[in-house]
């Protein structure tokens, strides 16, 4: 009888885990199409990527505060100090803001599918920057993996029929910003020994990102948006979906591992590329596109399998053993 109860409990846990992974893939894929629709569609006509990103970060800041401080349904990890906040969290927040801003801007110029193909180059950017700051070690195996990914992205770009170099520049800028953010997060974990789950990170980071976006928004988009007729319901739902996506990452990582998120991310990328070809008339996939992207994804999958063996994942932050006895200077 006890064995049956244990089996039922195990199966129930397995179902919840698979459901959380499916939720993450659905929300992650859906949010990409939602953002593209809001920014580019004739129905909404909201071509303000900076304003949209600012709205997301402001919405996230308010919800994080309500969930952790007012309703107290979630707990923020302790150990944050003013010195760490200024030297680490603010730069991470700035890079996160830049990543979202440039990535959303790219949707105005290139297709969703091509954007996802370009994002496959991310491990290369992270590895190069990691070598520069001493977090990664150059090896023949890693060079081979990076070469495979780079070759695949180049081939998929060559196969793009309607390439827009302005969009490519924006997307590559977003990739570099995201790589810098991941490097800064790894430094925060390995060298400063700070333990932050994704929700805690969003709690500390969202206000910084919002402020970093607010300043350029005043000069670049505010005057254009003054005369725009806001679709409050659509933009609120878009912001809520973005926040739900961040919570789904927290849910998946808490039930599985950072490697699972990476594998789910690969599945999501393929899903986005294929679905975008069905949804958007502007997306025309070629055999060269798909071949190059397949090669890049093989490289990314190999990298994802290799990376956790060389150190703790930077997606799931954990306390460094080196600094586990170090006491914080004081609460923020």
Curated annotation (Swiss-Prot):
Question: Where in or outside the cell?
Answer: Membrane
List, as start-end ranges, the regions of compositional bias called Polar residues: 312-322
Q: Which InterPro entries match?
A: Sugar_P_trans_dom, TPT_transporter
Looking at the record, which segments are called Disordered? Answer: 312-332
Q: Has the keyword Transport been applied to this entry?
A: yes
The entry's family comment says: Belongs to the TPT transporter family. TPT (TC 2.A.7.9) subfamily.
Protein name per its UniProtKB record: Probable sugar phosphate/phosphate translocator At1g53660
């Amino acid at each position: 009888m006890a064995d049956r109860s244990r089996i039922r409990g195990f199966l129930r846990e397995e179902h919840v885990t698979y459901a959380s992974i499916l939720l993450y893939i659905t929300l992650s894929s859906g949010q990409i199409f939602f953002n593209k629709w809001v920014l580019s569609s004739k129905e909404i006509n909201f071509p303000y990527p900076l304003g949209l990103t600012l709205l997301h970060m402001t919405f996230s800041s308010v919800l994080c505060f309500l969930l952790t401080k007012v309703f107290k349904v979630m707990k923020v990890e302790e150990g944050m100090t003013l010195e760490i906040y200024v030297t680490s969290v603010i730069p991470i927040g700035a890079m996160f803001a830049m990543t979202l801003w440039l990535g959303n801007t790219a949707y105005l110029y290139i297709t969703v599918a091509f954007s996802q193909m370009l994002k496959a180059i991310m491990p290369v950017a992270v590895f190069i920057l990691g070598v520069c700051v001493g977090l990664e070690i150059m090896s023949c195996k890693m060079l081979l993996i990076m070469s495979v990914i780079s070759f695949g992205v180049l081939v998929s770009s060559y196969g793009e029929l309607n390439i827009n170099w302005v969009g490519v520049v924006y997307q590559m800028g977003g990739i570099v910003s995201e790589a810098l953010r991941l490097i800064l997060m790894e430094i925060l974990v390995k060298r400063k020994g700070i333990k932050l789950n994704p929700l805690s990170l969003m709690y500390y980071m969202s206000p910084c990102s919002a402020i970093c976006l607010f300043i350029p928004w005043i000069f670049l988009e505010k005057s254009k948006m003054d005369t725009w007729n806001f679709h409050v319901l659509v933009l609120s739902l878009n912001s809520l979906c973005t926040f739900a996506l961040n919570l789904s990452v927290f849910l998946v990582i808490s039930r599985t591992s950072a490697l699972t998120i990476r594998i789910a991310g690969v599945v999501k990328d393929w899903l986005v590329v294929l679905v975008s070809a069905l949804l958007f008339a502007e997306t025309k996939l070629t055999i060269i596109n798909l071949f190059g992207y397949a090669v890049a994804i093989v490289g990314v999958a190999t990298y994802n399998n290799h990376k956790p063996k060389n150190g703790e994942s930077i997606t799931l932050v954990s306390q460094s053993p080196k600094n586990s006895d170090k006491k914080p200077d004081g609460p923020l």
